[in-house]
Each structure stands twice: as structure tokens, then as C-alpha cells.
Amino acid sequence: MNCFIGDLQTKGSPSYPSGFAAVGTTTINAETPNLKRKGVWGYHPQPGAGGSPPLAKEQAETDTMAKHLLPLLLTLAWTPAWAQTPPDAVAPEGASAVLTEGGSPAVAQALAAKAAGEPVSADHWMVVAANPHAAEAGARVLRAGGSAADALVAIQAVLGLVEPQSSGLGGGAFLVWYDAEKGELTTFDGRETAPRAARPTLFQDDAGQPLKFLDAVVGGRSVGTPGTPRLMEVVHQRWGKLPWGGLFVDAIDLAEGGFPVSPRLAGLVAKDVEGLRRFPATGDYFVPGGQPLAEGSVLRNPAYAGTLRTLAKNGADAFYGGAIAQDIVDTVHGAEGNPGVLALEDLAAYEVVERPPVCVTYRAHEVCGMGPPSSGALTMGQTLGMLRGRDLGTLGFASAEAWRLIGDASRLAFADRDRYMADTDYVPMPTKGLVADDYLAERAALLEGDRALESVEAGQPAWDHARVMGLDDSLELPSTSHFAVVDRWGNALSMTTTIENGFGSRLMTKGGFLLNNELTDFSFRTHDAAGHPIANRVEPGKRPRSSMAPTIVMKDGKPALVVGTPGGSRIIGFVQQAIIGYLDWGMDVQAITAMPHLVNRFGTFDLEAGTAAADLAQPLEAMGYKVEVKDLNSGLHAIALEDGRLLGGADPRREGVAIGE
């Protein structure tokens, strides 16, 4: 099964029989290095906290249990032993502890499983989201008989409140959806669009030079037309089972009653005080009285509750017109020192686009995700396609040779990404040629040898277009959020959602939500040094290229693994590594979220500090790589479907949990 977009031959939304699929063994066996059980992943309880095993599913989930167990789990404080903030192009969102108080028995059980490094197991449904409040909201919907589409609405509404720096109503999202009744995969593009008044020189100064990055980010210039509210509505109208208005109740209650500020949110606010204080409304919320939000303090957002009530009553049209739309436009145009050009007409014209998935074959599975304007599925598909003929399973995680192959295949794929990939509604692209078997075999031949490739260049895939595109060097920031859901009917979704940079444009509307800075995902330049036009340049109405890679891995036409992560352009490496861990190295779904990261996009190998990845620095350097050991904070969330069971895993680097029944 191969399904693509653009100029690829396509089967449209491929038909599969409904139900779940067994994926073979996912336990670490005698032939596989027992990395997880030896604890080399680096996630350990704090000294003196003990090592409480996960609660048995059969144990009654009582309020008393939660009351006494949760404080113990919170002492485990999900801060990896290596947590640090090394220099980077832009500092990633940091690893942090979980919520400081509150939580249900289901959250207590989820935290216990996470602390023990074990998946959460369920029979009927599963949700994995980036914050316990959001996961609980999704779980309540599913428990009440709601579908994955219903859960999506509830989860996103809560994420915009408790994790406002990462996603929200003012941003965009990509969704991969499996329809169990029809046995079909499809994807939805809720990416932000450039305003109609945007010009290719939007991020250039009067001399035609690119602006400094953060000068472009902070303010109205970087704000694209949000897509998330319309995406929520489109998916609910198609697959929702519960009334739309009731799906916002949890988020409204939290916004009005307040919630404790998590260590992660508090830490990120403290690191960005000056940016957040740039605009009064944002500063008043995140830095009240000149003091950054304190961990554990109760934060309320009645304005956001009001916005949600309006959406609950009147639907997404109330966001894209009327008072909310006018407030968005006024906020963008009123950004002192850096106003933008977003107009009411842009909001009124916004549409979500349904697109066929991009799928590539790997280890007898089909790895399916978003096509352009996302580069995620294509770049990951190219990398995995180049590795098909390599026995990574025998080499294992601890092999420098395995990482040489993965790293250089990724570099070759990123070279193609930077030259060719953009919004195919605006730019012609060799989509079919990039993942053609003969082209991938040609690129894979470059991996022969035992040393790092000295340099990589974009290839020349088959293409019926003569245009030569320029090389892009746009920067995609390591923020964003992700969640995964499987419901009782077998519908599955993988959704990556974002406002781009942490806290986006730093502009907060009167409606209590932040606006994105998504337009800075475009190239700031229009042409490269050779004079070739850059595919990912700014154009009116265009969607900026993304690395977001929500993924559903299929086996025999049925979902086997639902996975995704935040992380900027490292998203691609994080997700493909999780898939390799699952399919090649026999790791379970929790282990693949905790696996140490090694990522190579542009020649330098980024190795995750304080983990087994750092042990590979010397052998990789001996192969000719430049190596940097640094904090790499993914937020992987995954659900495996094995023999009729659902297994959920949540990245211990962040606050997410898996809840299922």
C-alpha cells in the first residue's frame, strides 16, 4: 500500500478492514540488549523515593488510593538526571516535573506506570496527552461513550489553557485519522496560512536583509491565520458522537476555577520574562505584578473560559468572524514595534484541507503521516526507505554503526527537504520521485563504507518539472504539543498541535489565548545565493513548511502504532527513532518514548546528555562526525495496538500521561 499526495500515484484513502492488528513481539528479548531493564535510559526515581511498581489494573481506583499514592509519585519529579540548558540555536522547552497537586486515580496509576517505565494497558480505549489535565479531559469523554473526535476537542481545549506556550486556539495542527468503520486513513491540514497582504519580503529589512530571528518572532508580523478551531470542528462534525458544546466543560471549569501552575510552565515563563512583558496583556497574565508565575500557584483565565463558551454555543464560525476575529486582528495590528498584516478577510476565508496520507513501507508495515506542507512523513519516509536493506535489529541501539546509517540517511533526506519541500498548493514538488524505490536505492548506496559522509547534497529525483529550487535555511523552533487517542470503536488519531515558538508571538488576545508565530517557519529569503527561488518562501495564503510528523503505523491494513512528538525540526528524528525502536529493536511502547536521542539533520550528531546516547560520542567522532551532547526534550506519545490490547506510553521528559480502560 502506497498513498501519497501531490503528483504521486494514489489510492486515495486506502481501504482496510476494521479492527486491531498484532505487531509481533515488542518485548526486549534475549537477543536484544536489555537497555530498558538496565535503566540506561537515565530516568530514575529521586534518591530516597523508592521504586513503587505500577498499580495493578484490577486494584480499585478509589479516591483514597489517589490521595495517598499521588504525593509519593510526585516526589519522583519527572526531571531527568541530565537536565540542563545547553546552548542551542533556540533553547528547547525544558524537561520538568509533573503537576504539583491534584489528580485522579487514573492519573495516579498513569504516573506509577511511567515511574516504573511500564506501558499503561487497556482493553477499550486509550488517550496519551502532554498534561494530566488534558489526558483526564479526553478520558472522561471516552469513558462517557465519546469518540476519538470528541476527545480531540476536549484535549485541545484544555491544552490551550494548561500548556499555553505550546498550542492553542491561536495556532495550527496536523491530524492523521484512522476511520475504523470504513477502514480508511486520511489526514487533515489545519496549518496556519499567510495573510493575503503578506509579501515574500515580509521578514526582510529595508536593505533586503533577513531580520534577526527573534525580532521577527515577537509581535504581529509573525502571526498566521489560526487553523486549530476549524480543525476541531471539522473532525467533530465528521466523527463526533457527543454534543459539541459539552466537550468544552472541563476546560471552562479549569479556566474559571483555576489550576496549579506546573513546574514546566513556571520554568518556561521564568526564562522568557522579557519577551512576555513586551506586551501588556501577556505580561499581566504570565508575569503578574512583575513576578513570573510561581510553580504551584493557582492560575485562572476567565477570558479563555468566555471564549470557549462562545465556541461551545456558536461553533468555530464565532472564532473566524465577529468579536473574537476582530480582537485577533486588533491584537496583531496593535503590536507595538512589530505589527502584522492579518485581516478579517483572512480569518473568514480559512479552510482546513483534507489530504491523502503519505505512506512508505518499512519492516512489513506501512508508516503513514502528513504530506506537504509538512515535511515530516516524506523526510522520515526517505530515511526509513534508505534503511530498509540494513539489519538494524542485529546491530542494536548501542551500535555506532547503526547510528552512522540512521544519521547519514537522515542527512540525505534533510538535504532533499531543504531544496524541494514546501506547500504543494503553491510550489511544484517531486513528491512521487522523492520516495520512489529506485531513487531511495540510489541514495542508500551513498551509505556504503564505515565513515561519516563528508558532505551531502540534495538528490535529483524523477520529476516532470524543470524548475530548479533554491536551498532553504529556515529555522523551526522546538516547541509544540502532541496527543494520541484510540477509542472503543477502533478509531485512532495522531495529532501534533502548535503555536510554533514557546509562547508563540507573545501576543495574547482579550479572549485569553496566545497567537502563533507560525509565519517564521517560512524562509526569510526569497532566493538562495545562486539566485534560485526558495520553495518555502512567503506567499499570500500559503502554508509554511513544517516538520510535524503525526504518524500511524499500519500492519495488514490496521493500526499497529500511533505516535508523534513536539521538537521542532528534530521531530522527524525523534519519531523515526521511536519507530525503529519498536520495529527493529523490539522495545515496548513506553521504552520507545524514553529511549535516549541521537539526531543528525545537517551533519552534527546531537546526543542526549546524561543518557546512553552520550556514550556513543567517541565512536561517532572516530567515524568523522562532529558531536554535540545536549538536552533533547521530546514529548513522544504513543499507543501500540497488540493482540486486541492497547498499550500507552508517555515521554518521561515532559508532563504527559497515558490513561486507558
Task: State the predicted function of each range.
Residues 161-168, 172-187, 338-343, 491-557, ...:
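Active-site rim segments in enzyme catalytic domains, especially the processed small/beta chain
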Residues 11-15, 19-21, 37-53, 58:
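Short, low-complexity intrinsically disordered segments enriched in small and basic residues
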Residues 71-80:
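Bacterial N-terminal signal peptides
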Residues 104-105, 389-499, 508, 519, ...:
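Internal maturation/activation junctions in enzymes
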Residues 85-136, 140, 148-314, 319-321, ...:
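Noncatalytic scaffold domains of N-terminal-nucleophile
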Residues 541-543, 575, 584-631:
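Extended C-terminal subregions enriched in glycine
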Residues 354, 477-480, 546-548:
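Short, small/polar residue-rich loop motifs at catalytic or cofactor-binding pockets
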